[in-house]
Amino acid sequence: MKAKIICTFLIVNFITLNMFAQDPVLKSAFNGKNLKGWVVPENNIWWSVENGILRAKSGPDKKGSILWTDKEYTDFVIETDFRYDEGTVDTGIFLRNDKEQIQMGISGSLKRDMTGSPYIVGKKYPVEAQNVKEILKPNDWNTIKVIAIAGYYEVWLNNKHVMSYTSDSYVKTGPIGLQLHPNTEMTASFRNIKIGKM
C-alpha cells in the first residue's frame, strides 16, 4: 500500500512538471452577464449577476446553495477573483463532487479563516494553507488558482503558492462548484472565472 502511494505521488509530480511546462489555456467560464454555463439551482435566490460580478448571498432560511458548472472536468485548473463582502463568509470551490473542496473564508467548524485549505469529508482539513493571513487582502479583491490532477491539489493565492495535498478519495470526473454554505449570513463576490483542461 505504501509503495502504491509513493508511486502515485511520483506520477502526479511528473504530470505536474509537464503541466507547468505546457501552461494550460484558461477559458472564461463566466460571461459577466448571466449564469449561462452553470446549473442554476431551482427557485434560485442565492446567485445573481450584476456589472460583471457573480454574487452569492444567503437567503432568509440560510439554506445554502451550490452553483455547478454545466460541464464536467477530469484534470483542470480554475482561477477566479473573489471578495468577501458581508457577514461570516464561508464558501469554497468543490472539486468534481460535494465531498472535496478548497475552503474559502471562515470554517464553520474551526471558526477561523481557512482560505486555500482542502476540506475533505471524513478527514476535515488534512493540511492547512500556509501564510494566508499575510497574503489575503480583507475587503478587497483577491485571486485564487486551484489545480486538480487526479487527487493532487495545489492552490495559489494572489500568485503565492499556499497549499499542496494528495487525496486518496477523489472523484475522477465531475463538475466544479461554487459554494454558499448553509447556516450563515454572508455575501461573497466572484469575477473573471476561468477554467482550463489539462
Question: What is each PLM-predicted segment?
Answer:
Residues 21-198:
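Carbohydrate-interacting regions of secretory-pathway proteins
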